[in-house]
Amino acid sequence: ILILIFQEYFKYNKNSFIIGSLILLVIAITITMGFIKNAPSITLNKKGITFKNQFYWWHDLSSAKLTGKGGMIFTSGECAKLTFNDSTEIKIIDDFYSNIAEIKCFIQQIVIEKKDKIEEFNHEIDSLELTKEDATTYNGNPIFTLSGIMMWGLMVLFLVVPVINSVGNIISKAYAFLFFLSALLYLLFSRMYHSFKISDQYLQVKKNYFFWRKEVYEINLIKEIVFYRYSRHSNGVIVITKDFNSKSFLVANLSDKTLLRMKKDLEGKKIKVRNECISEN
């Protein structure tokens, strides 16, 4: 896409286009090499771990932090950090491994807890029991946010255009463009709004604009919840379960005060909340 933009911009100057394309190519290669460098193959067994063709013994492991930030850009930033007696540190970036949950479970249960095999957690939810639960809802207002105002403003304009359609074909073209732009913004922004319901046994996460879609977690199977900054005007919430499966939810509709109230509620249920984006002073 960027190359096409350069091509249009520099169509009258071929030398500038070539230089611009080469710059983009160098940037793409640099980023790709950075990802490859930080995503080597990993082999685990009960004796140790092979990382970047180097074998490390588990009996030399001094500390293991399986959740937390690793400082890698263009990713969620979550990683596992293993530190050995010689001060060697291994960072396993979550987003680079499709089986990261299995890797972390092995380290937690087999290496740290000395279990003979990995315990599997039952995530099946009793829907009847779920409806009986009294829950506190954290919803916010998805309309009166920057992205919400942009999205609904365009939709209102899309509905108003036919009423004032008196310029013929020009308005028809504008109407088609508004329809496309409104649909695009709806698809982009609707994923940014989630509401939460917290009861004694369950945490429910619902999409505000696709209310029939939801995630349900048992409170006693949640290991940690992370509040992080997604953009200048939006935060996000990551739910990490005890088997190290994780999912991120954008919460542009929830104010900082609402998130802090939710944090207090979660901590009251003995859930660790890692707040990386909101001042609590």
Predicted ranges, named:
Residues 50-104, 122, 205-263, 276-281:
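Non-transmembrane, membrane-adjacent beta-strand/coil modules in membrane-associated proteins
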Residues 26-65, 183-217:
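Conserved beta-hairpin
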Residues 70, 141, 169, 275-276:
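Secondary-structure junction/capping motif
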Residues 1-10, 87-89, 95-168, 244, ...:
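N-terminal membrane-targeting/pre-transmembrane regions
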Residues 17-22, 37-39, 59-66, 117-124, ...:
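Short, mixed-charge, low-aromatic patches
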Residues 271-272:
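Extended alpha-helical scaffold/tether regions of large eukaryotic proteins
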